[in-house]
Amino acid sequence: MNLEQIYKDCGAYLEGHFLLSSGKHSQFYLQSAKVLEDPKLAAKLCDELAKIITSYKIEFDSICSPALGGILAGYELARACSKRFIFTERVNKEMTLRRGFEVKKSEKFIICEDIITTGGSALESAKIIESLGGIVVGFAALANRGFCAVENLKSPRKDNAKLPENLPLFTLGNFEFEIYDETNCPLCKKGSKAIKPGSRGN
């Protein structure tokens, strides 16, 4: 499966000057919503991701995703794995679990995102699950932006990674994009202004 080509074919592989959710800047952005708007393609991708997770014999009960980006990927992965699905969301900048969702004591979760960059949002969701008595046994995403170690791809962990080193991350592919702090962003130095994805129709 050529994940990069899938993103390009869907118009989801964007080039410009982007402000990422992590606060970093990048010349490239992956707009997974453009990939996941096709239900058949979303099912195909998450069926493949489910096969990878199953092959590692990870035992889990449910899947949780951070809103908003992770919801479609997480729901489709839950469908493919025949598991329960819940999501966390930000309220006043704090990640929370709402909408009547509950976590059972010792319930095992995989945290699923559409894209993992440093893993900050996924880690916030994991901490919510654990604070409610759940157990996080791994992480999953359609793609990794090259910072977190990926179990099935045997890719190394980089300094920016926030996901726990003792838990596996499973993805369909790696996208190796440079990301920058605002202070050393070459695009900023050229006079370009970073755009938050979604703010101008992207």
Swiss-Prot record:
Residues given in the record as 5-phospho-alpha-D-ribose 1-diphosphate binding sites: K93, E113, D114, I115, I116, T117, T118, G119, G120, S121
Gene, per the UniProt record: pyrE
Signal peptide: none
Catalyzed reactions per annotation: orotidine 5'-phosphate + diphosphate = orotate + 5-phospho-alpha-D-ribose 1-diphosphate
Organism phylogeny: Bacteria, Pseudomonadati, Campylobacterota, Epsilonproteobacteria, Campylobacterales
Function description: Catalyzes the transfer of a ribosyl phosphate group from 5-phosphoribose 1-diphosphate to orotate, leading to the formation of orotidine monophosphate (OMP).
Annotated source species: Campylobacter jejuni (strain RM1221)
UniProt xrefs under PROSITE patterns: PUR_PYR_PR_TRANSFER
Assembly, per entry: Homodimer.
Keyword Membrane annotated: no
EC number: 2.4.2.10
Binding site for orotate: T117, R145
This protein's UniProt keywords: Glycosyltransferase, Magnesium, Pyrimidine biosynthesis, Transferase
First-tier enzyme category under EC: transferase
InterPro entries, per the entry: OPRT, Orotate_PRibTrfase_bac, PRibTrfase_dom, PRTase-like
Protein name in the entry: Orotate phosphoribosyltransferase
Pfam families: Pribosyltran
